[in-house]
C-alpha cells in the first residue's frame, strides 16, 4: 500500500500545482479517485500509451502493473468500507461506444479491482440520450450533489470512450465549531483585496506544528471516528502560498504532516465556512503532465481493452466540498450574511488568507481530497 500511497501522493501534488497555476483561483479535487479512474484505463493501455500513463501517475516507482491494481483493490475496499462515521462515495465508470467490442477480460478486471463497470452506450446514433444517461448515473451515485457532469455538446457521435469520475464526501468534525461563534470577518485574498467571509471559531486542543523553512503552520482537524483528518497548511501573512506550493513534494508532505512529530496544544482556530464545487476537463491537464498519446486516435494503444482503434475522448472530474461548523459536507445550504463589526482579536491559527487543505485517510495515508482556498 505504501508504494501506492507514494505514487498517488506524488500525482496529487503534481495535479495541485497544475490545476492551481492561476493562484487567484480556488482548487478542489480528489486525487485518489482520479488516480483510481485513470489506473482503470491504464489496465487496458499498452506500449507508449501505457508508458506515458505510468509516468504521469507515478506508477513507474511502484513495481509491476499487477501490484498497482491489487493495491487499488485494497485501497478502495478500505476507504469505501461500510460502518464508518463518514460518508464517502466514489463513482467511477468507463462508458464506451457499443460498436467497439470491449474485451470481457478487461471488463472483468474493472469489476474485480476497481468495483467499476464498463458500460456500453450508443454515442454514434443516440449521443444526447447517452449524455443524459451518464449524468443521471453520476447524480444517483453522488446523492444528487453532482447533477450535470457532462454539459450539452461535451460528447458527440465521434466519442468512443468517456471516463467518469465523481466523488461525494460528508464528515462531521470530531469537535464541532459552535455556530454562535461564527461571525463575519474579512479574508485577505491578496495584499490589496479583502472579501467578507463567515469565519468560524473554536478554542480547543489540536495537533499542530510550524515548518520554519516555509514559514507555515500546519493544523490537523480530525473528523468523528478519527479515520480521516483535514490537514491545513497556512503560511505566515508575509509568505506567499506559492512559495509553499513550490516547495511541496510528497516526501516533504509526509515528513511535515507526521502526527507523531506534532505538538498537541490548545489553539484558537479561525477557519472560514466555505463551499467549493470544481469541475475539470482533465485532457489538457493530463497532456501538460505528459500523457498525450491516450487522447490521439492512431497513437493511442488500448489493445488491452478492445481490438478496435480507440482513444480517450473525455476525462471529466467533478467534486464538491462544504466546510461548516458541523464538519465537511456536500449539501447545499444558504446562510444569511450578517454584517457585524467586531473588535479583532489575535487568534493563534487564523485562516484569514489563502491556505492549502488536504483530507487524508489516516490508515492508508491516502490523500482523498486536495484543495486551495484562495478567495471566498
Curated annotation (Swiss-Prot):
It comes from Pongo abelii (Sumatran orangutan). It comes from the Eukaryota. The modification N6-acetyllysine is found at residue 195. This is Serpin B6. Signal peptide: none annotated. Transmembrane segments: none annotated. SMART domains: SERPIN. The gene is SERPINB6. One of its GO terms (cellular component) is extracellular space. The lineage of its organism: Eukaryota, Metazoa, Chordata, Craniata, Vertebrata. The modification Phosphoserine is found at residue 151. Belongs to the serpin family. Ov-serpin subfamily.
